[in-house]
Swiss-Prot record:
NCBIfam families: AmmeMemoSam_B (TIGR04336), PRK00782.1 (NF001987). Pfam families: Memo. PANTHER family: PROTEIN MEMO1. Transmembrane segments: none annotated. Belongs to the MEMO1 family. It comes from Methanocaldococcus jannaschii (strain ATCC 43067 / DSM 2661 / JAL-1 / JCM 10045 / NBRC 100440). The lineage of its organism: Archaea, Methanobacteriati, Methanobacteriota, Methanomada group, Methanococci. This is MEMO1 family protein MJ0403.
Length: 287
């Protein structure tokens, strides 16, 4: 019997009632900080990498919606797309790098893991363990799923996921994980999307946060994962998911990606009006 991973932050980070959740996702798309358009029907042509924030939808949902709007233009429902979602481990539970199989439940329906991809990953990449403990209370991957499920409900795409939770975010680990994501995607001939779930600077004044965030955004747009790691360390940037972003960039470059584009940037202060201690949010696409 398949393991079921139940939502940990439904009713906290996003509504737990399906109708309210759909309304909120639609509001994120149409918000002044969002793409101001609903998702569209597109065509899958090549691997896609995305940077997505993972705070409560009221704070970062409109920025997050930019990534899913661009994704909608680059996927279709003709066959399933495997979405590898890399998130940091905020709980301190579980293994250093943890992948999980089974089913992830959302208020909008279940999302299945790509079991074959998951098995190949933990068997071939020594740093990755098959471990559900890290995932049970972790929000960074979970908050991406309602946006994916919403695209399915619109018949824009069909998805399976590979959820990877990273407590270890050192450069060598992140690059190795990224390399194996690309290697297995090629071996299994998967349609592939790689999402790095990360917020940027945490709880600093707007002026400082925006300057620090500009540094890491520049590194991401230059697809320079080594520089990103060094800047996070040297400038003491409190970006929670730099490891997932490094892994995403490595995977995408290995899969032939050539360019990255910033889709949107804002801080929690732009939403709340309190600029004294903000969190930075960005969406970007790599292809």
């Amino acid at each position: 019997m398949n393991k079921i991973r139940y939502p940990a932050v439904a009713g906290l980070f996003y509504p737990s009632h399906p109708d309210e959740l759909i309304d909120m996702i639609e509001q994120c798309y149409l918000h002044k900080f969002g793409p101001k358009s609903m998702p569209v029907h597109g065509t899958y042509e090549k691997p896609i990498g995305l940077l997505c924030p993972h705070a409560g939808y009221v704070y970062s949902g409109p920025i997050q919606a930019h990534s899913y709007y661009e994704l909608s233009k680059r996927v279709d429902a003709l066959e399933e797309t495997t979405v590898v979602i890399l998130g940091p481990n905020h709980t301190g539970l579980g293994s250093g790098v943890s992948v999980m199989d089974g089913i992830w439940r959302t208020p909008l329906g279940d999302v299945k893991c790509d079991e074959e991809f998951v098995e190949e990953l933990w068997r071939k990449c020594e740093i990755v363990d098959l471990d559900e403990t890290a995932h049970l209370n972790e929000h960074s991957i979970e908050v991406q799923l309602p946006f994916l499920k919403h695209l399915e409900l619109l018949n824009i795409a069909k998805f399976k996921i590979v959820p990877i939770c990273m407590m270890f975010q050192d450069y060598e680990t992140a690059v190795e994980v990224g390399y194996f994501i690309a290697k297995i995607a090629k071996e299994l001939n998967r349609r592939i999307v790689v999402i790095a779930s990360s917020d940027l600077t945490h709880y600093e004044p707007q002026e400082i946060a925006s300057k620090k965030d500009a540094i890491v955004i520049k590194d991401i747009l230059e697809m320079n994962e080594k520089e990103l790691y060094e800047d996070v360390v040297n400038y003491n940037i409190s970006m929670c998911g730099y490891g997932p972003v490094i892994a995403m960039l490595k995977a995408m470059k290995t899969l032939g990606a050539e360019k990255a584009k910033l889709l949107a940037y804002a801080t929690s202060g732009d939403i709340t009006g309190d600029y004294s201690a903000v969190v930075g949010y960005a969406s970007a696409i790599v292809e």
